[in-house]
Amino acid sequence: VIDKTFRLTPLTGAILMMALGASGTLAAAPKLLVKEPTQSASAGAQFSSRLIVRYKDNTAAATDRSSKLNAVQAAVGRVGASTGARSSAAAAKATYVRKLGIGSDLIKLSSTLTAAQVDKVVVELKNDPSVADVHIDRMLRPVDIKKSVAGTDVSPQLVPNDPLYAQYQWHLSNPTGGINAPAAWDLSQGAGVVVAVLDTGILPGHPDFAGNLLQGYDFITDAEVSRRPTDARVPGALDYGDWEEADNVCYDGSVAQESSWHGTHVSGTVAEATNNGIGMAGVAPKSTILPVRVLGRCGGYTSDIADAIVWASGGTVEGVPANTNPAEVINMSLGGGGACDSATQVAINGAVSRGTTVVVAAGNDGEDAANHSPASCNNTITVGATRINGGITYYSNYGSKVDLSGPGGGGSVDGNPGGYIWQAGYDGATTPNLRQL
């Protein structure tokens, strides 16, 4: 488990706070489109018929694909026999998808099973002597809603010439709630540091990125989620949008929404060019972003996120070229209800063993972070959100799992060419700011 005692240099403190993005009132200036956090989907809200299974060593299922599938198919059959739902269970087929970078196997069940039946299949597999661990391949997601706001000016100690810096980016310089970024910039601006942003991907054409982007990779393996033509993983991490065209599309209670361009916002918060006379300032303007796409329509699967963690930190993932720019820091401004699962934890442990610091958002639900993932995972730095006056925001998750907190609102680039947006929430601020720590 990570040593929770941190030595915070001015730059480190600045980056940590900035990742959260300050959330308070804004200046009466040109209005920015603003996004504030809403609650994430509860654990199990989104149906998934995909299972992450780890088989015990020295069993046939550990090495033989047929044995892996037979174990799952047998569990499905037992569920059908015990519930009397023979028609739906009998029609369900287990399909082997792939081996994950952490060594577990991803197996997909056909959609004839209900969510309750999938839960029972998991219970059956946990009782199988050949199975070491099994859980549902949950979907995690960024959560934002749009809103207009106005507020008050800030008085920075050092004012870069980025035109929106002084009016909107209080989280960088406000003496009470800010991160004192100007003092940190005097010491370091992140040169030579690679930050992997595991998110919705990137829109690379914005002028304020100023060449701070590596190519990255798209790890989404479901065409319905990625909005690409196939399930194949591809280089580039291009954000195809995560809009939801109607209510209840992703789960009961989900609402229609436009694309968040969340990954572009987070990447800009970290590394958009500073003092270049364009837009806003980045907390670590000389760092380099490695965009890794794991979130799309309705979110992203845990299995894809786990593989992305392995790859971003320099580990090996079958079918994906080696990462020639392993990240010093991984940022995950994403999450969902439920405690940390074993697949995510194993992936994080591997990343830390390779020398990568993993920073995650605590969550925007106003709840104990222990009940959210990856906020509750060990070997991470979990970051909550504070207000302009330094107190915790109304929406920030809290509790013993939260290691650090920083301004919960930040302006950055958005999905429109040359555009900017203000987002409130630790998700867009916490991780980017922590990278500078």
Label each PLM-derived region with a short phrase:
Residues 340-358:
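Catalytic-core regions built around general acid/base machinery
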Residues 129-133, 191-195, 286-290, 325-330, ...:
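Loop/turn elements at helix/coil->beta-strand transitions in domains of secreted/extracellular proteins
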Residues 2-26:
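Gram-negative bacterial Sec-dependent N-terminal signal peptides
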Residues 15, 26-166, 185:
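Primarily auto-inhibitory N-terminal propeptides
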Residues 182, 193, 200-201, 212-343, ...:
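Subtilisin-like peptidase catalytic core
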Residues 199, 363:
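Active-site glycine-centered loops adjacent to acidic/histidine catalytic or metal-binding residues
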Residues 31, 99-102, 126-194, 202, ...:
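Protease zymogen maturation seam
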Residues 222, 233, 356, 372-437:
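Extracellular S/T/G-rich loop segment that most often corresponds to the catalytic His/Ser-adjacent loop
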